[in-house]
Amino acid sequence: AAPFTEETQMTQTNPILPEVRAGTVSREALVQAALKEITQNYREASLSNVAREYGVSLAYVSECVRAQTGRTYKELLQKHRMETAARMLRRSDMNIQQIISLVGYENTSYFYRLFHERYGQGRASA
């Protein structure tokens, strides 16, 4: 196999990677990658994954997200998780513990507090 097989494969799966290596990846591309991480991997989403993938610092990606969206990555992730949980509560017969786990929370009381802050109500009226 060619010595650059791994790099070639990474470039094919992530077309922005060569731009990152050349120092030309846009802030918008980083923010889009962060938002994609939230929507596609919200259960275990991490901004560190995006920073590592694009070869930039966590602080830089975080700053890009906040500058472009007006919210922190954590706020955006929580919003997506809460909206997903609310949808699941309305449309499924899963119990609340299953939903809490599926949306990425391990601490039930923390989930309830966030849910109540966001919606001002419990499961029955969600």
Positions of predicted regions on the chain:
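Inter-domain helical "communication" segments and dimerization helices
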Residues: 1-45, 49-60, 67, 71-73, ...
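Intrinsic disorder/low-complexity signal
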Residues: 5-6, 62, 82, 105
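Low-complexity, intrinsically disordered/propeptide-like segments
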Residues: 7, 50, 92, 114-117
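Terminal helix-turn-helix DNA-binding modules in bacterial transcription factors
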Residues: 32-40, 67-106
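Alpha-helical DNA-contacting segments of helix-turn-helix folds
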Residues: 45, 64-88, 110, 114-126
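Append "Primarily bacterial transcriptional regulators
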Residues: 48-57, 61, 65, 99-106, ...
